[in-house]
């Protein structure tokens, strides 16, 4: 009885503010902004996307969303990471709509195909190289200009580690058209991978 009276006095005194009655936000969802959502942010007032853990458990693939594959400051990524990110964004409509990525990657039995949106850049602004199975793609507006001129244009950069003995890195093809770069990396055939040299013994 005494405890009941004490509770009534506590409630009537106003000490229990409305903030204590607010429901606690579930830890199963988070709102966040990432670099991969920059283009989405520019076209929407709602800058947050709720991601529910129970829908797709957090794995290493989810960490890839924290920076765009073709962000100038992103670290080198393996090909499997890039393809996994594509699968993750494609399979989940929420993430796919939120990212609006300016790139795509797909792999077939014959080749690897990469597409990068580089608005404002021409083929003279793009450099593609392969060193120790690492494919490097760089694009910089006004890359051919002289050193004296200030360069403050767009920049694109990415490094992708390709698996060894799987792709023909010496016959990579690239095409730049209307601000879109398409890169094709042919695959080796099975007999080409098994590069066995028999040495005759005299």
UniProtKB/Swiss-Prot annotation:
Record's keyword terms, sorted: Mitochondrion, Stress response, Transit peptide
Gene Ontology terms: cellular component: mitochondrion
Family annotation (CDD domains): ACD_sHsps-like
UniProt key word Coiled coil: no
Subcellular localization: Mitochondrion
Keyword Cell cycle: no
InterPro entries per UniProt: A-crystallin/Hsp20_dom, HSP14.7/HSP23.5/HSP23.6-like, HSP20-like_chaperone
Domain sHSP residue range list: 94-202
Transit peptide: 1-31
Gene3D superfamilies, per database record: 2.60.40.790
Record-stated family: Belongs to the small heat shock protein (HSP20) family.
Alphabetical list of PANTHER family matching this protein: 23.5 KDA HEAT SHOCK PROTEIN, MITOCHONDRIAL, SMALL HEAT SHOCK PROTEIN HSPF
Protein name stated in the entry: Heat shock 22 kDa protein, mitochondrial
